[in-house]
């Protein structure tokens, strides 16, 4: 069993296609494909790339795995623009990309596609792993090796997992947390609950990389839950116009 864990396509169709091609060339086949949010964005080089990425995710080609998708920062901004969240008018998006960026995102995804994105998961709990865009604290939570250890401990406790895979930072990293003594207490309406010892075993947070954020270079993660083996992949690719890509495909580019 081997998982491919992606994040941050950000509308970069060429990058996603490059990763899919790389997956086909692996010696050990992938059994599950996870995409941890930010499937849309403003990194596409062609008009309509966000729509094309969503179509590609929804309808894989014959022989390809159906991706399991969760919601990321860019999707949440899209929901805000379309009145599908508790925060209207996407103030986070406006602060990040300005009015032109807001307009570009609004025009790049159809209402039906936004509804499909809204139906996707917040995260995935598999075995002793949590796969999520940010963390249980929220979609915008950006964990990195520089995040304070006590904060990483908090996120792992909230995740109730030994391995937390996240994509918000866009970086590839592996960060082990080994608390020597850590207790947690939950307070409910009935008062404080019994203290729990959280220091029994080492846990880790894994940054899974970014497929589309860095032009020409896609990064993603492979993980085998049976052997606990983890590896990071880097794929270099050339960004091309749609017309050229179609001609290459007609010649057998990427065929099995």
For every predicted segment, state its role.
Residues 10-15, 41-44, 74-79, 137-139, ...:
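Active-site environment of divalent metal-dependent phosphoester hydrolases
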Residues 1-4, 124-130, 199-205:
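Beta-strand-turn-beta hairpins that frame and shape the catalytic cleft
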Residues 2-6, 11-107:
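Core catalytic region of metal-dependent phosphoesterases/phosphodiesterases
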Residues 20, 51-61, 114, 150-156, ...:
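Short amphipathic alpha-helical segments and helix-helix/interface helices
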Residues 6-7, 33-38, 68-73, 132, ...:
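Active-site neighborhood of phospho(di)ester-bond hydrolases with catalytic His/Asp-centered motifs
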Residues 175-256:
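Acidic, His/Gly-rich catalytic cores of divalent-metal-dependent hydrolytic chemistry
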Residues 17-18, 47-48, 82-83, 143-144, ...:
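Short amphipathic alpha-helical segments
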Residues 26-29, 106-182:
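His/acidic metal-ligating clusters that form di-metal
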């Amino acid at each position: 069993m081997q998982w491919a864990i992606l994040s941050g396509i950000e509308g970069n169709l060429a990058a996603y296609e490059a990763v899919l091609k790389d997956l086909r060339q692996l010696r050990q086949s992938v059994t599950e494909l996870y995409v941890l949010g930010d499937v849309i964005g403003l990194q596409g080089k062609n008009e309509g790339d966000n729509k094309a990425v969503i179509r590609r995710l929804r309808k894989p080609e014959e022989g390809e795995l159906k991706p399991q998708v969760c919601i990321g920062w860019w999707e949440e901004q899209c929901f805000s623009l379309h009145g599908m969240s508790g925060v209207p008018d996407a103030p986070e998006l406006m602060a990040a990309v300005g009015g032109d960026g807001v307009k570009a995102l609004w025009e790049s995804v159809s209402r039906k596609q936004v509804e499909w994105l809204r139906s996707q998961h917040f995260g995935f709990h598999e075995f002793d792993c949590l796969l999520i865009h940010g963390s249980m604290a929220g979609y915008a939570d950006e964990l990195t090796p520089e995040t304070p250890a006590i904060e990483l401990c908090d996120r792992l406790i909230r995740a109730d997992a030994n391995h937390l895979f996240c994509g918000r930072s866009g970086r590839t990293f592996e960060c082990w947390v080994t608390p020597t003594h850590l207790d947690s207490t939950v307070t409910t309406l009935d008062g404080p609950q019994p203290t729990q010892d959280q220091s029994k075993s080492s846990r880790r947070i894994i940054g899974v990389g970014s497929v589309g954020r860095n032009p020409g270079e896609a990064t993603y993660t492979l993980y085998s839950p049976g052997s606990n083996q983890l590896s990071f992949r880097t794929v270099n690719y050339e960004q091309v116009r749609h017309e050229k890509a179609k001609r290459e495909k007609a010649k057998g580019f990427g065929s099995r």
